[in-house]
Amino acid sequence: MQHPDLKNRDVLLLTELDYGMARSNNRFVARELASRLRMNYAFAPVYIALQKGSGVEKFVDGENKESIHGLALFSRYPMRNIHAISLPNGKDKMKGAEKRLGSLRALIADIDHPIGRFRAVTTHLDAHCSRKHRELQMRIILNHLENLQPIPTLIGGDWNTTTFNSQNAFRAILGYWRRVFMGIRNVAMNHFPYPDRYFERGLFRELEQRGYVYKELNEYGVGTLHYDIKSVEKNTNLRDWVPAWCFPFIFWAAGKVGGRVSARLDWFAGKNICVVDKPKTIHELRDKDGNALSDHDPITLDFVPSAQ
């Protein structure tokens, strides 16, 4: 990693890492990253994929080998008490466009850092579910952490705080019209980048009630996932979940705010964490050939564990 804001990081919390998937050339992505970065790592399988993926991924060459999808923790320092907990699915993963076996998880490890031991948690909350279900998933994680030895803790990952109830297309369509009536510009400016203000308030309230903070640990109000009406890839992926007749309405609404909409889906939350420098959201992260490395923008945080 040569990006100045990413290189030399002591700990990485990554989600959606493949092991033997055609879309990533059947690599064990976590192991390769750990080897190249010279970091320790822990990998937690999440799904066994029964097809190549969704959207544009369905058209890649080759076939899956191991067909595993998961999340990982990386550390330059020893990791201890490594374990994962399962999170309940928000819908039957065999009924969606992308058929999979398994469920999302949270991966947990204690990091023996020279400045002090702390606990790192990487998690991926459900996208195709209700907001209440994401809140439930976070509650399960927090309940588990409360049963562990109390040490400074950082939780991070893709929490899919889209503001939508996406259990099915019907609920998502109803949610679309609700946002239209609230005012397209209002929602795009005041809710998608700030899901904690209203739509996803329950999830963030759960964190705060357990003593976790999040606003000062993130570049608050800056989107990490972007939809552009001109993106063929984004629209191809969206067609797996939304009926074709919806697209003129989606284009119309997005066009009201310049054709591009950004939402904050990726977060850090911490307890007994002291921020050292301003958190950042890194836009337009690309490889040497100009290809986007992820559909989400990475987020960074410099911190030290503080006394409890």
What feature does the model see in each segment?
Residues 84, 131, 145-154, 161-308:
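Metal-dependent phosphoester-hydrolase catalytic domains
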Residues 32, 136-141, 202:
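Alpha-helical elements of Rossmann-like donor-binding domains used by nucleotide-donor carbohydrate transfer enzymes
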Residues 1-26, 74, 109, 119-123, ...:
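Active-site beta-strand/loop signature of hydrolases that rely on acidic residues for catalysis
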Residues 17-19, 87-98, 123-131, 190-191:
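Surface-exposed cleft-lining segments at the edges of enzyme active sites
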Residues 66-67, 71-81, 100-124, 275, ...:
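Beta-strand-turn-beta hairpins that frame and shape the catalytic cleft
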Residues 19-22, 49-52, 92, 127-131, ...:
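Active-site environment of divalent metal-dependent phosphoester hydrolases
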Residues 1-59, 63-68, 295-298, 304-308:
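N-terminal, active-site-proximal structural segment of metallo-dependent hydrolase catalytic domains
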Residues 12-15, 42-45, 154-158, 213-218:
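Active-site neighborhood of phospho(di)ester-bond hydrolases with catalytic His/Asp-centered motifs
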